[in-house]
Amino acid sequence: MKQLGFRFRTWGGKRKGAGRKPKGGKRVGHVRRATIGKCPVHVTVRMLPHVWNLRSKRAWAVIGRALYAGACRWGMRLCQYSIQGNHLHLIVEGESLGQAMRGLGVRVARGLNKMMGRKGAVWADRYHAHVLRTPNEVRNAVHYVLTNYQHHTGRITTADYYSSASRENGVTLPRAHTWTL
């Protein structure tokens, strides 16, 4: 009796160069989102690199209008916000966060594209959401959102004009419904 040769597979398994190649950039994973319930949520939305600086008067006019118009729509209530150079921080409450962020994203994208004279996406990725379950977490998140610009630039100001801490920018937000805010 003669022993036959064994053929090894040439695909699959761990080997050099295997797997999906990295695309680069910060990506939000496509995992199932946590249930919100009646807790507030800290949401961060990043813009694509070609989008102009969000902390300009022109961009503020567009984003402020979108935030004001969408503050109490799509099953979401916007409680606090801060606009940075290339991203937004939002503290929101509500049941249907996905629908609300989609609606807000459409408003912001249409306005920014019209301002820049272009078409296409402006959000870099999915939004990042962190559910704030304890009063301490809420307090820390609100402080982080409202003082984010001061923290990153080192400039000490009374209130950031491009955040909900400023009373001069003309955006009045609705009152929160959860007890933690």
Task: Give the ranges of each region predicted by the language model.
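Short Pro-Cys-Gly-centered "Cys-loop" motif that presents a nucleophilic cysteine in a tight turn
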Residues: M1-N86, E93-L181
